[in-house]
Structures are given as C-alpha cells and as structure tokens.
Amino acid sequence: MKNSLIKIRKSLVKSDAFDEYVKEARSFDIDRMHSLQQRMRIAMTLTVLFGLMTIALALAVAALTPLKTVEPFVIRVDNSTGIIETVSALKETPNNYDEAITRYFAGKYVRAREGFQLSEAEYNFRLISLLSSPEEQNRFAKWYSGNNPESPQNIYHNMTAKVTIKSISFLSKDLIQVRYYKTIRELNGKENISHWVSILNFSYINAHISTEDRLINPLGFQVSEYRSDPEVIK
C-alpha cells in the first residue's frame, strides 16, 4: 500500500513537471511569435517610409529638371581679329524675338550707312534718314554731303563698298554693337578689306509717318547716336 502511494506521488510529480515544461514551452513560442510579429511590423513601417522617401525624391528631381538644362552653343573665332563670340539659336520667348528684330534693323542700318553703291545711294540715304533721330539725320546729312571730302560720294566715287555683318550684340537695353568688315572693290577688280565696329544708341518711337515710309520702318526703330571705328586686329 505504501509503495503504491509512493508511485502515485512520483507520478503526480512527473505530471506537474511535464505540465510546467509544456507551459514554459508554450510561453516561449508565444513570446517568439510576438517578437516576430513586432519585427514584421517594424520592417513594413520602414518599407513604407523608404517608399515614400523614394517617391518624394523622384518628384523633387522631376520638379528641378526644367531648372537645370544643358544648352549647347557654338563658339566662333574671327580669323582676322582673334575675337571670340558665341553663336546662339533664337529662343521662343518674346524678349528674344524683340532682340532679333532689333538686330535686323541695326544690321540694315549699318549696311546702308557704311556701304556704297551708286545705284542704291538714294534709297540708302532715305533709309538712314527714316531710321535716325532728327539730330542724327543732320549729322548724317552733313557727313554724306558732297561738300565733305570724307563723304562716301567723294571717297568711293566709281567704286563699291560692301558691308558684311560679323556679329551684333547688346551692350545694354538701348545700346548695340555691330562688328563688320567692309570690302571696297575698285573698277579694276582689286579689293581692300577692313574691319570695323559700330555703336548705336537706339529706341522705338511711335512717329507719324506716311504709309510708304512705314513699309521701310514699320516699328519706328530710331538711332539717336552712331559712331564707327576701325577694329583693332590682333
């Protein structure tokens, strides 16, 4: 009987130990599962965070792309003078179109004023008058007069002077520089080339002129001061 009780007691002790073991094992599994779930939540949070950061970075780069563009340009070196200038394309903006129009009139003005061909002399005189302020008209008329020994009429006489524009650039909003070379051709075919720089003060005015004159100067381009000097050759 006593032995039976001892066996039962040992059996109960083993049962209690086993239950305790199972309880501890189950608790360990639960803790490990909780830890795994917590790590998964942290990983998912970090994944979402990095994803949002990537999207934000992509949007920032896309927004900055128009602000940083690479514009190719060409540099041209004048073989005669060694002067370097940048050759650029016309951009589709109002300011650049305004500049293009001004360059057109400035080039036209210099070609007419510095060039000479007897058959075009009368038209060019009229063109310069229409594109000049009253003060500059007077200065030009005195310079062009036959009484002036330096007048193109007296210098070139039976020769021709052709102006070729090399570059036109803005020094300020109302001051423009025109670089050109002049080819003087004599009757015997001999040519003499010289390089020049002209500076023009200009503006646009709303003058009352005839329809015929408006066809020559439709926008009221007007030169108020003009000078032309030989370009220094390096």
Swiss-Prot record:
One term under GO cellular component: plasma membrane
Entry's transmembrane regions: 42-62
One GO process term, biological-process aspect: protein secretion by the type IV secretion system
Membrane topology, Cytoplasmic segments: 1-41
Periplasmic side of membrane: 63-234
Function: Component of the type IV secretion system VirB/VirD4 which could be a major virulence determinant for subversion of human endothelial cell (HEC) function.
Protein name in the entry: Type IV secretion system protein virB8
Organism encoding this protein: Bartonella quintana (strain Toulouse) (Rochalimaea quintana)
Gene: virB8
